[in-house]
A protein has these predicted regions:
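Long, highly hydrophobic alpha-helical transmembrane signal-anchor segments
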Residues: 5-50, 97-129
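Hydrophobic alpha-helical membrane-embedded segments
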Residues: 37-66, 130-138
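C-terminal halves and exits of single transmembrane alpha-helices
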Residues: 78-109
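Eukaryotic polytopic
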Residues: 114-148, 152-153
Length: 175
């Protein structure tokens, strides 16, 4: 059962979400460009990884999250998931973890592998990835660490653990 929290999870701010979504679009464009420029036959695999990430983990993770059907800081993920999936009362399990990790591995690492001999494309991709990931932590993950009551987030999410260990946020749960 989720622990009680004396705090209210903040709604996603439109300006922050616009910045995050824009940075994500630039990151995706640089990834697509790196693949198309260096390994064009890999593009469909990369696109399949992206589409898999945009759907499958949203069922296994977002449809089970306390922010389901709410405009959370992860690119309005709770609202996005509610458009495609019914809320699931099933507990988080390894399927969500593997769906997220597997699809992320395909669409985030294929551009770097494709551009390994193209320094310009590799630097552009690495910079856009760093900016997007930094914004994601700042805009979404810090609030998730502070306000999440779903115990599986602290137990399984690697970014949750990194944010906590770096001291960027601490959970405000009460026991």
């Amino acid at each position: 059962m989720a622990e009680e929290c004396s705090c209210e999870w903040p709604q996603a701010e439109a300006k922050e979400q616009a910045v995050l979504i824009s940075a994500g679009a630039v990151f995706l464009a640089s990834g697509a460009a790196a693949v198309l420029r260096n390994r064009p036959r890999w593009f469909w695999v990369w696109l399949a990884g992206l589409l898999a990430w945009a759907t499958i983990p949203k069922y296994f993770i977002c449809a089970r999250c306390e922010n389901y059907d709410r405009p959370c800081g992860f690119m309005y993920g709770g609202k996005y998931a509610a458009r495609f999936f019914k809320r699931s009362d099933r507990p988080f399990n390894a399927a969500g973890y593997f769906a997220e990790g597997g699809s992320l591995a395909v669409f985030q690492f294929l551009p770097a592998i494709a551009a390994r001999r193209d320094p310009k494309a590799l630097v552009v991709y690495a910079l856009t990835a760093a900016v997007f990931q930094s914004l994601l932590v700042k805009i979404a993950c810090i609030d998730c660490v502070r306000f999440a009551r779903d115990p599986w987030k602290a137990r399984y999410c690697p970014t949750f653990k990194i944010v906590e260990r770096l001291g960027l946020a601490t959970p405000e749960r009460t026991g």
